[in-house]
C-alpha cells in the first residue's frame, strides 16, 4: 500500500482547489507574462526597443494598468521572477496592482531546458533543486500558483519514450512540491508545432504525452483537483501542407483530452503555441463548442496571443501606452468570449491579430 508523505490536510486541499477554481472561473483565463529576459529581448527587438530592465517594466506596466474591464476576463497572471518585485511608475508593486483587481498571482519556477543525454537532441527541464525553498518564499510574496514548462518535438524519432517519461516525472515532482506549499501547479507539457506532421500525428503524440504525465502525477500522489493543465492545442505542424478547420482542431484536441486527462483536473488552460492572436481565439471558441462532453473548464493561458497587438502599438513610446493597453483589453475580452464558445471571426486579421507568432524551437 502506497501513501503520500507528508499528506495534504483537508484545509490544504480546500485552499488548492479554491485557488484553481478562481483562476478558471467562467469567462476567465490566464495572462502569461512570464517571458524570460532573453525572450523579452526577442519581442522588444522586433519593435526596435532596447532590452533593459526599465523597458521590460514599462511594457509589463502597459498590461497591468488595464482597467476593470479585464476583471471578468483574466483570472490569473503568471509573473517572471524579475517582474514579481517591480513597481509601477507610481511606486505601487505590480503584485498589489494585480491582486487589487481580484486576479490571482502566479510565478514561473522552472529554470529552462537542458539536453537530455541518450536522446536525439531532446531536452528535460531543470529547476527542481531548491524548488521547495523558492515556493515557500513565493507564497509569502503573494504567489498562489506556479508554472513549469517541459518541451517536446515531433519527428520520425521524437518524442522518445525516455524524453516523455523523464519530463512527466519532472512535472509530477514539481507539482507535488508546489502543493506542499499551498501553490497550485500549472503543468505544461508543450509539444512544439515544429515539423510537417499532420493533425492525426499530433493527436497521437499528445495522447501519449498526457497519458504519461497523469500516470506520473498519480505515482507522485498529486492532488489533481488542485492542479491546472496547460497543454498545446492539437494542431498540425507548422510545415504541414494540409489546412484544417477550427472544428477539426477542436475535435482532435477534445478527443485527446478525454482519453487522457482525469475529470478531477480543475481546468485546462491552453497555450497559444505560436498561433496568431485571431487563430488562437477562434480555435479556443471551437474547442468550447465541441459537442463532446468536457468535464473541465477549457480556457486560455496566452502570452504572445494576448500581447502581440499591444506590443506592436506600444513600440516603446510613452504616448502610445494608453492605446497599447486598449489593444490588450480587446484581446482579453475576445478570449473571454472564446473560453465560453461565444467568439466568432472579427473579419480583420490583416494586422498583428493575424500574424503567426511561430518561432522554431521556441523557448521562454
Swiss-Prot record:
It catalyses: beta-D-fructose 1,6-bisphosphate = D-glyceraldehyde 3-phosphate + dihydroxyacetone phosphate. Expressed specifically in Purkinje cells in the brain. Keywords: Glycolysis, Lyase, Schiff base. InterPro entries: Aldolase_I_AS (IPR029768), Aldolase_TIM (IPR013785), FBA_I (IPR000741). Signal peptide: none annotated. Its EC number is 4.1.2.13. It comes from the Eukaryota. Induction: By phenylethyl alcohol (PEA) in the olfactory sensory epithelium. GO terms for cellular component: cytosol. The record marks 364 as: Necessary for preference for fructose 1,6-bisphosphate over fructose 1-phosphate. NCBIfam families: FrucBisAld_I. Homotetramer. This is Fructose-bisphosphate aldolase C-A. The gene is aldoca.
Amino acid at each position: 500500500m502506497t501513501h503520500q508523505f507528508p499528506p495534504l490536510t483537508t484545509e490544504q486541499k480546500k485552499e488548492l482547489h479554491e485557488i484553481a477554481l478562481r483562476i478558471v472561473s467562467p469567462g476567465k483565463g490566464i495572462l502569461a507574462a512570464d517571458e524570460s529576459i532573453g525572450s523579452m529581448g526577442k519581442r522588444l527587438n522586433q519593435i526596435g526597443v532596447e532590452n533593459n530592465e526599465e523597458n521590460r517594466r514599462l511594457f509589463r506596466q502597459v498590461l497591468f494598468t488595464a482597467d476593470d474591464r479585464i476583471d471578468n476576463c483574466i483570472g490569473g497572471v503568471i509573473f517572471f521572477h524579475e517582474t514579481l518585485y517591480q513597481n509601477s511608475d507610481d511606486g505601487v508593486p505590480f503584485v498589489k496592482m494585480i491582486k487589487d483587481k481580484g486576479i490571482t498571482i502566479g510565478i514561473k519556477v522552472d529554470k529552462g531546458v537542458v539536453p537530455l543525454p541518450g536522446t536525439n537532441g531532446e531536452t528535460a527541464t531543470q529547476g527542481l533543486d531548491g524548488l521547495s525553498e523558492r515556493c515557500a518564499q513565493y507564497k509569502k510574496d503573494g504567489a498562489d500558483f506556479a508554472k513549469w514548462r517541459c518541451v517536446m518535438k515531433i519527428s520520425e524519432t521524437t518524442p522518445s519514450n525516455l524524453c516523455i517519461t523523464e519530463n512527466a516525472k519532472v512535472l509530477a515532482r514539481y507539482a507535488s512540491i508546489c502543493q506542499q506549499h499551498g501553490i497550485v501547479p500549472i503543468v505544461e507539457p508543450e509539444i512544439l508545432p515544429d515539423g510537417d506532421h499532420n493533425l492525426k500525428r499530433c493527436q497521437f503524440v499528445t495522447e501519449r504525452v498526457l497519458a504519461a504525465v497523469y500516470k506520473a502525477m498519480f505515482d507522485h500522489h498529486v492532488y489533481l483537483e488542485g492542479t491546472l493543465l496547460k497543454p498545446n492545442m492539437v494542431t498540425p505542424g507548422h510545415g504541414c501542407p494540409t489546412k484544417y478547420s477550427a472544428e477539426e482542431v477542436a475535435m482532435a484536441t477534445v478527443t485527446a483530452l478525454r482519453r487522457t486527462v482525469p475529470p478531477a483536473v480543475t481546468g485546462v488552460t491552453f497555450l497559444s503555441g505560436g498561433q496568431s492572436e485571431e487563430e488562437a481565439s477562434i480555435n479556443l471558441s471551437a474547442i468550447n463548442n465541441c459537442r463532446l462532453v468536457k468535464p473541465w473548464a477549457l480556457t486560455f493561458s496566452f502570452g504572445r496571443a494576448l500581447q502581440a497587438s499591444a506590443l506592436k502599438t506600444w513600440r516603446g513610446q510613452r504616448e502610445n501606452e494608453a492605446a497599447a493597453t486598449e489593444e490588450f483589453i480587446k484581446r482579453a475580452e475576445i478570449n473571454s468570449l472564446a473560453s465560453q464558445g461565444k467568439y466568432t471571426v472579427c473579419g480583420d486579421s490583416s494586422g498583428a491579430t493575424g500574424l503567426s507568432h511561430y518561432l522554431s524551437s521556441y523557448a521562454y
